Swiss-Prot record:
It comes from Dictyostelium discoideum (Social amoeba). It comes from the Eukaryota. It holds the Pfam family TM2. This is TM2 domain-containing protein DDB_G0287015. Residues 9-57 form the TM2 domain. Residues 106-137 are annotated as: Disordered. The lineage of its organism: Eukaryota, Amoebozoa, Evosea, Eumycetozoa, Dictyostelia. Its main location: membrane. It is found in: Membrane. One of its GO terms (cellular component) is membrane.
């Protein structure tokens, strides 16, 4: 036996129709998933008519809250191949950054060290190029 609950997308028009015609019985509250307050309305005649009037103003937020709670608006796309972006006639592959290989910083020679103060040089990383001679066996 399956216990899946299939929640409907609540409609504001339907909720107002239920409020107008059956609001004193709390049917509109049951419709938007407010079971406890629906029972209270059922037993008290819409809390003696006051809750019936207040719900004319609260109903849009009740419907919105119900829909946000029971319906996820996220779409997930699972693709076994890389996604290719298309703009007109040009195709773009997703950006894939190239790895950088760290190199030892250049140290001054011993004689330079004593003759002048050491000036640190900026390290400028170079992109990995697999066909470069320095990476060939």
């Amino acid at each position: 036996m399956s216990h899946h609950h299939h929640h409907h997308q609540a409609s504001l028009v339907v909720a107002y129709l239920l409020l107008i015609f059956l609001g004193f019985f709390g049917v509109h509250r049951f419709y938007v998933g407010r079971t406890i307050s629906g029972v209270v309305y059922l037993l008290t005649g819409g809390i003696f008519g006051i809750g019936y009037i207040v719900d004319f103003f609260l109903l849009p937020s009740l419907v919105c809250h119900y829909n946000n709670k029971h319906h996820d608006h996220t779409t997930v796309i699972v693709s076994p191949t890389p996604v290719v972006y298309q703009s007109g006639s040009q195709h773009y592959a997703p950006y894939q950054p190239q790895p950088y290989y760290a190199q030892q910083p250049i140290q001054p020679q011993q004689q330079q060290y004593y003759q002048q103060p050491y000036q640190q040089q900026q390290y400028q990383p170079q992109p990995y190029q697999p066909n470069s001679p320095q990476y060939q066996p």
